[in-house]
């Protein structure tokens, strides 16, 4: 008798949403930020940051997983070395939890939680507001490309 009730409660608790793209805007949290544009996104986890090209699509469970380029050596001196990475997470209403996993080392950054319309609160590292203002080449350099060019 209890099993059907539990199954019914579990089904009612499952929150499915219409698949789509993460909303354009500023998503902020403690030591985290996600600046979403129609053509991509810029994310910060602590003193690291990454870029996503294109929209961030999510499924009916709010889950997403997209390719990114991630810089883990941005502070105190940004050397402009980017790693291929995956940014993944889950959207839940106006909040979103995400992390980044570097492809070459497997290092995981996060997870962090951000909220749409909230300003990021960064303690030591400022968030990059304008991608064009960042002092780096427009094409991300991978760690392997930097090593072959003789850059530490």
What do the PLM-derived regions correspond to, one by one?
Residues 30-72:
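N-terminal glycine/threonine-rich, aromatic-flanked beta-hairpin/loop signature
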Residues 17-33, 66, 98-100, 121-147:
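Tryptophan-anchored aromatic micro-motifs
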Residues 66-90:
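An anionic, turn-rich surface loop/hairpin at beta-sheet edges
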Residues 10-11:
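C-terminal motif of bacterial Sec signal peptides marking the signal peptidase cleavage site
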Residues 149-152:
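Short, solvent-exposed mixed-charge patches
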Residues 52-56, 75-79, 106-114:
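A short, polar/proline- and glycine-enriched secondary-structure boundary/capping micro-motif
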Residues 82-128:
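Surface-exposed, polar helix/loop patches in the mature regions of secreted/periplasmic/lumenal proteins
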Residues 1-3:
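Bacterial N-terminal signal peptides that target proteins for export
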